[in-house]
């Protein structure tokens, strides 16, 4: 069953037509429209020169070098029995990446509508994610169900910051995210979510989204100081291996577009590094 779902992801599923995404996990209207909930767009800028190729002997050395060459970023990769992380590795707001465990929790509870999952995961629709949260009972019930999927980070029952979702403010380190993604294919209720993660959204073709066949979810929003953060987690192909990756960026300028560019630059170096990458432990949803 899971391998069949993987083939669907690999082949590429037709993108759903409904798309309504807001910048960050700001509370959205119950029935959002594309006009009321604008999608993030890649910034218009002059092409930057290619970043230097990182030379390293192993994944730890590679990640340390990549993080050092990209200040303000964090990166982690995980395999069946290993995890490596560098740069900003302390817990940061999960933003919309938390919609993945939320959707899985809804799938397990039997309250996940396929279209709602597609909107919440592929297009990062906040109203759709809120629907899943409420379908789980909201508050403590939804937080506990979602936290059981994550297994590590604590999911708030109420929004710690006004105007933002409770689940989006889950503090989730990149290392724990990478480990979470590495095990996704072995978990119950993940097939529809992995399929939605594998559908390309033109508005999110940066960072991991620039790698062909990536199965990923992104999140973004303003930190408490107002500077925008952007992060992604997913399964990607590196050196012939299916690798679980989690990345984070916060631009010194505070600009969301710059944070996007930082993730893209980091991913270019990640893809070019010639090291032995660890295979994800569970690859049913792999590229």
Regions found by a protein language model. Give the residues of each.
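Short glycine/serine- and small hydrophobic-enriched flexible loop segments
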Residues: 104-111, 134, 179-183, 268, ...
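Active-site SXXK
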Residues: 91-111, 120, 245
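Structured C-terminal helix/loop/strand segments within mature extracytoplasmic catalytic/sensor domains
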Residues: 2-10, 15, 22-64, 112, ...
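Mid-domain, small-residue-enriched loop/turn segments at the edges of structured enzyme/sensor domains
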Residues: 130-188
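Active-site-proximal beta-strand/loop segments in catalytic clefts of secreted hydrolases
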Residues: 78-80, 106, 120-125, 132-136, ...
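A short, well-structured edge-of-sheet supersecondary motif
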Residues: 52-88
């Amino acid at each position: 069953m899971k391998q069949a779902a993987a083939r669907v992801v690999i082949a590429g599923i037709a993108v759903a037509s409904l798309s309504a995404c807001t910048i960050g996990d700001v509370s959205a209207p119950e029935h959002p429209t594309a006009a009321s909930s604008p999608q993030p767009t890649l910034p218009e800028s002059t092409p930057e020169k290619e970043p230097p190729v990182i030379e390293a002997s192993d994944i730890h050395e590679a990640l340390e070098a990549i993080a050092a060459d990209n200040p303000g970023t964090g990166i982690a990769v995980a395999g069946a029995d290993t995890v490596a992380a560098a740069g900003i590795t302390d817990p940061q707001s999960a933003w919309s990446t938390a919609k993945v465990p939320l959707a899985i929790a809804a799938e397990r509870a039997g309250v996940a509508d396929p279209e709602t999952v597609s909107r919440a995961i592929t297009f990062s629709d906040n109203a759709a994610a809120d629907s899943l949260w409420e379908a789980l009972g909201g508050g403590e019930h939804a937080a506990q169900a979602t936290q059981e999927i994550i297994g590590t980070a604590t999911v708030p029952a109420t929004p710690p910051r006004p105007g933002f979702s409770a689940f989006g403010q889950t503090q989730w380190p990149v290392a724990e995210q990478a480990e979470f993604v590495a095990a996704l294919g072995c978990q119950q209720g993940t097939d529809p979510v992995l399929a939605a993660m594998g559908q390309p959204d033109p508005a999110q073709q940066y960072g991991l989204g620039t790698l062909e066949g990536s199965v990923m979810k992104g999140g973004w929003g303003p930190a408490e100081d107002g500077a925008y953060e952007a992060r992604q987690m997913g399964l990607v192909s590196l050196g012939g291996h299916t690798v679980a990756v989690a990345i984070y960026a916060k631009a010194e300028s505070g600009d969301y577009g710059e944070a996007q560019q930082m993730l893209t630059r980091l991913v270019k170096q990640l893809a070019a590094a010639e090291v032995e990458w660890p295979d994800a432990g569970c690859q049913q949803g792999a590229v």
